[in-house]
Regions:
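Alpha-helical transmembrane-bundle signature of multi-pass membrane transport and export proteins
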Residues: 1-212
């Protein structure tokens, strides 16, 4: 499998998807980690705020879209060009991270939780897309390496995003840095998504997606 990895990482059939997925997973965890530190330390210092409850609430808010929209996301991937959906999702991510940046700048927990829900929805929609795109653009003997790279990249992005988000929040103006970095990463993810080759739906007879 090792011999198949490097050609894939240099191929337009795979590299833009890998970069897009990596940056999306990084942003998810950058914001989650930054929010956890913000709530735990900054708001707890002010008193009257149950930081532990807010952190648990944040986790639930991020996960909720997976339960609410997973079915619709899978159906959408069968009806619309998957590469186009990826681009739409990445445009949405820019606005989501801008909301998060505003939440950090204004020290607004509601805005941060709204951004977190948006990122959960972003991940819910993009999840089926990334796996559906692999067999569209890779030949059969490349699929194992492609899936392995996506999984490895995702876990690495989670690790880096979690560590960096927590670390940056502890420096001067860390919240602003996290917010600006999140928007910059979202912009980069959108640019990489534009290079994903088109993948039109194979069937136009799939039922319209339902939210739940």
């Amino acid at each position: 499998m090792t011999t198949a990895v490097w050609p894939l990482l240099k191929s337009r059939r795979f590299a833009p998807l890998f970069v897009t997925q990596f940056l999306g997973a990084f942003n998810d965890n950058l914001l989650k980690s930054g929010l956890a530190i913000f709530v735990t330390y900054r708001l707890a210092e002010q008193g009257g705020t149950d930081a532990a409850t807010l952190v648990m609430l944040a986790g639930g808010i991020f996960i909720a879209p997976f339960f609410l929209f997973s079915g619709a996301s899978g159906t959408l991937a069968d009806r619309v060009d998957k590469a186009k959906i990826a681009r739409w999702v990445k445009i949405a991510e820019i606005f989501i991270m801008a909301t998060g940046a505003a939440g950090f700048a204004l020290e607004s927990v509601p805005l941060l939780l709204l951004a977190l829900f948006g990122l959960g929805t972003h991940s819910t929609v993009f999840g089926p897309i990334k796996y559906a795109l692999l067999p569209e653009h890779l030949v059969e003997h490349e699929l194992v390496a492609g899936n392995a790279l996506i999984e490895a990249g995702t876990f690495l992005a989670i690790l880096i995003g979690t560590i960096l988000g927590g670390s940056l929040m502890q420096v001067d103006n860390g919240a602003v840095i996290v917010g600006v970095l999140g928007v910059a990463v979202a912009l980069t993810g959108w640019m990489s998504a534009r290079f994903i080759p088109l993948a039109p739906p194979r069937s136009a007879t799939v039922a319209r997606p339902r939210l739940i």
